[in-house]
């Protein structure tokens, strides 16, 4: 359409008139596109699925896109997202991204959705919505009033439903394990969710107290959600501790992961510890920085991913394409992959990638990775977070593997 508008305007000789006409045509086209009647024209008559999602990218985005490739063969998938920077709700066709409706008013979208034949609602992630608890009520309203009497499926990519600090890192920067000296409310009063004040307020919105937060989420799980899909047994145990009444609704369905060829590591003398993925505080940046202070001369730490303010004596590879992981592991002569996350990751693609390549792997005894690493013959589960001690535990583990390989 942009080409058509430019072609029409090209015929107008007066520049000022041409600019006004272009602006008028562009505004008219945007209004036509951003119209629910135009939007509904994209429906094919198949069953409709509503996919409620955040707009923050990351592993949740990867999961959504993989699911859309499967679901779009059977459903018209409508994806609802909230963009905090613009304060706009976006409703898009996941199977046809050219159709999009945007509005500041969620009630407009809710009223529209109640009038079409939605068969399923997937609550994939609500992090950074304007008010998460209000959004839970919107989803409940759509379920009650929708023509299709939809089933509601919740996906547990993080722990937002337990605490707005969705990785369960407390005000002291440590994994809380659902407890804090003085209680959750004391932690919550001091907890900073972002260095950016606007982001901090967005992430805290709808959460006056943790007690009220869990009451509203508990009501959603009990009265709105028909199933709760989690990706690992250890994560289910955490959810059940917070909400014992939901146990019968939980289904454990691990992510499907890409299989990689085995990495072929050449003989070498030094020890190379690979930290796989983008490393933030909750992903273990503090652990890596402390290890770097006591790194022996023959031991290297390589972050395959990104890490801000990394110590000078570690290597940061930067962004990478997942399909090239075996070659990258071979380039750095990887001896072991270390997953330093200090929060209970709900799945961890990087853990599966390392196992798929046949590499030794180490992680802390927290969350989904620990369960898989404990069953892996080349896995090391570190029972406490003590970076100085952990570094030499990893080094000793690599040395023992080398001795076994010589036998």
Predicted regions, residues:
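Catalytic cores of nucleotide-sugar-dependent glycosyltransferases that transfer UDP/GDP/TDP-activated
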Residues: 2-407
């Amino acid at each position: 359409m942009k080409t058509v508008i430019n072609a029409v305007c090209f015929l107008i000789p007066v520049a000022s008139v041409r600019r006004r006409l272009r602006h008028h045509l562009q505004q008219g086209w945007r209004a036509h596109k951003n119209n629910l009647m135009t939007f509904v024209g994209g429906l094919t008559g198949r069953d409709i699925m509503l996919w409620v999602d955040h707009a923050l990218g990351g592993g949740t985005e990867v999961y959504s896109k993989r699911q859309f490739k499967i679901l779009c063969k059977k459903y018209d998938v409508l994806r609802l997202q909230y963009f905090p920077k613009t304060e706009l709700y976006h409703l898009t066709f996941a199977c046809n991204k050219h159709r999009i409706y945007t509005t500041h008013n969620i009630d407009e979208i809710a009223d529209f959705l109640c009038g079409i034949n939605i068969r399923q609602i997937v609550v994939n992630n609500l992090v950074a919505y304007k008010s998460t608890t209000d959004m839970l009520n919107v989803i409940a309203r759509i379920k009650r009033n929708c023509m299709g009497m939809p089933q509601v499926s919740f996906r547990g990519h993080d722990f937002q439903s337990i605490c707005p600090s969705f990785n369960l890192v407390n005000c002291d920067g440590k994994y809380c394990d659902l407890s804090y000296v003085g209680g959750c409310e004391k932690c919550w009063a001091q907890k900073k969710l972002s260095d950016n004040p606007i982001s901090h307020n967005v992430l805290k919105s709808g959460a006056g107290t943790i007690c009220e937060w869990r009451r509203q989420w508990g009501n959603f799980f009990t009265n709105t959600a028909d199933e709760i899909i989690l990706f690992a047994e250890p994560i289910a145990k955490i959810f059940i501790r917070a909400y014992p009444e939901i146990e019968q609704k939980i289904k454990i369905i691990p992510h499907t992961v890409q299989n990689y060829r085995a990495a072929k590591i050449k003989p070498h003398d030094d020890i190379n510890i690979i930290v796989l993925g983008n490393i933030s505080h909750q992903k273990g940046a503090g652990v890596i920085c402390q290890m770097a202070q006591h790194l022996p001369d023959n031991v290297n730490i390589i972050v395959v991913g990104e890490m801000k303010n990394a110590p000078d004596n570690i290597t940061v590879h930067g962004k990478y394409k997942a399909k090239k992981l075996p070659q990258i592991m071979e380039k750095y002569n990887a001896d072991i992959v270390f997953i330093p996350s200090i929060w209970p990751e709900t799945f961890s693609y990087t853990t599966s990638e390392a196992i798929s390549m046949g590499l030794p792997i180490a992680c802390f005894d927290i969350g989904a990775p620990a369960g898989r690493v404990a069953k892996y013959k080349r896995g090391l589960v570190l029972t406490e977070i003590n970076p100085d001690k952990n570094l030499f535990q990893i080094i000793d583990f690599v040395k023992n593997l080398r001795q076994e390989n010589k036998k």
